[in-house]
Amino acid sequence: MERYRDGDAVAFERLYARHKGPLYRYLLRQCHPREAAADVFQEVWSRVIASRDRYEVRAAFKTFLYRIAHHCVADHYRLRDRKRENRMDSVDDHEEALAVQGYEQPEARVSQAQLDDAVRLALSELPEEQRNAFLLFEEGGLGLKEIAEVTGVPAETVKSRLRFALAKLRRALADDLGMRVTLQPARMET
């Protein structure tokens, strides 16, 4: 980011190429409806570009990027909530109700699509702080200290949120899929 700030356009291309996949996966899991992830993704990179001249090295670029993403997701939900308040018959609410009905799968064997749906539903049922910590960890690839910097809480709080999120996800997936689920992140060190 420092090289980009100093005028090296190729440096930005490298940053974008390195971080676009994990960032987009993180946003796909955070944003509802899923189509909103593309808009939030654009907003994140727009803010990175806009902050070019003001950028100061305080942490790793990845931490800087996910802090922006964290704020953009919060802005997305604030805007969505305002729109919902303005219209009582929300199309989104109707779509959510239909989507939840689609998660009831009677088959004993679980297809990848069913597993994806079950994971999406289980993630949506987590408290926001736990979901955010889990997605920053799993999709963003951030460590405990980086998540603590992004979210503004101590690393031990992040660790606690991750443990609660994992326990709830295990239970929810076991209930939904009728099978034992092993979710064990390998890098839960501080």
Locate predicted features.
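N-terminal module of bacterial RNA polymerase sigma factors
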Residues: 1-22, 107, 124, 146, ...
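C-terminal edge and immediately downstream basic/flexible tail or linker adjoining helix-turn-helix-like DNA-binding
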Residues: 3, 85, 89, 118-121, ...
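Sigma70-family region 2
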Residues: 5-6, 29-32, 43-60, 79-81
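Short, charged helix-capping/linker segments at alpha-helix termini
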Residues: 5-14, 24-43, 155, 178-179
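Structural recognition of an alpha-helix C-terminal capping motif at a helix-to-coil junction
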Residues: 25, 39-46, 59-71
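Arg/Lys-rich amphipathic alpha helix in sigma70-family domain 2
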Residues: 50-57, 67-88, 100, 104, ...
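Internal acidic/polar
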Residues: 83-109, 185-189
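Helix-turn-helix DNA-binding module
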Residues: 120-157
